[in-house]
Amino acid sequence: MAKQTKKQKALVTKLGDNQKLYAVDEAIALLKDLKSAKFDESLEVSLNLGVDPRHADQMVRGMVTLPSGTGKDVKVAVFARGDKAEAALAAGADKVGAEDLLEDMQAGNLDYGRVIATPDMMGIVGRLGKVLGPKGLMPNPKLGTVTPNVAEAVKAAKGGQIEFRVEKAGIIHGGIGKLSFSDEALRANFDAFVDAIVKAKPAGAKGKYLRKVGLSSSMGPGLKIDLAQVNGG
């Protein structure tokens, strides 16, 4: 059996019982205290939900704006023409176009965190379904990424709006900021994220909806959160 390093031993000492349930603020403070990476680690939340996303009436998906932002520079591409294209550029879009943007993406240039389109451009965007779909980038009117108000959508994407979607096992993951953020900023983002998930509870969900909540950092341990400390828990 391999020997534990000093850092690993210190981690075990600080964590103690790995079955412990933490208050949200306590978990945030501990993960910041335990950070060891040279880069600015992300704070990540995971929620186990009482849903089976194989059933259409139990799908959980939507958008939420994190009040403290994400700490990431999100690249945004917009399919639009004319005044809408100019508005998207003015709002900070990284790439705006029509057929030319289609060809660029078909060539493999897909380094974007969000793709937005005006409704009249969906005939073009639809040809990218097999490319954008698997990456979760296909514009969707339900998520506000197919909209005539592209400027507002670009500002939202750049201003801390993130998408959430439940996975097969009923789990939702989300990055809610960087460990360099203040404790208060991270708590505000946590509350906003969880609140959005609670509000997105599908009609087909049976029994207890919010079953487990965990917090972790990019290189740190996962901490279980006391549901009594969580809004909607």
From Swiss-Prot:
GO BP of this protein: regulation of translation; translation
Pfam (any one): Ribosomal_L1
CDD domains: Ribosomal_L1
Superkingdom, natural source: Bacteria
Record keywords: Repressor, Ribonucleoprotein, Ribosomal protein, RNA-binding, rRNA-binding, Translation regulation, tRNA-binding
Oligomeric form and interacting partners: Part of the 50S ribosomal subunit.
Family, as annotated: Belongs to the universal ribosomal protein uL1 family.
Function: Binds directly to 23S rRNA. The L1 stalk is quite mobile in the ribosome, and is involved in E site tRNA release. Protein L1 is also a translational repressor protein, it controls the translation of the L11 operon by binding to its mRNA.
NCBIfam families: rplA_bact (TIGR01169)
Protein's name according to its UniProt entry: Large ribosomal subunit protein uL1
Organism: Novosphingobium aromaticivorans (strain ATCC 700278 / DSM 12444 / CCUG 56034 / CIP 105152 / NBRC 16084 / F199)
Gene it is expressed from: rplA
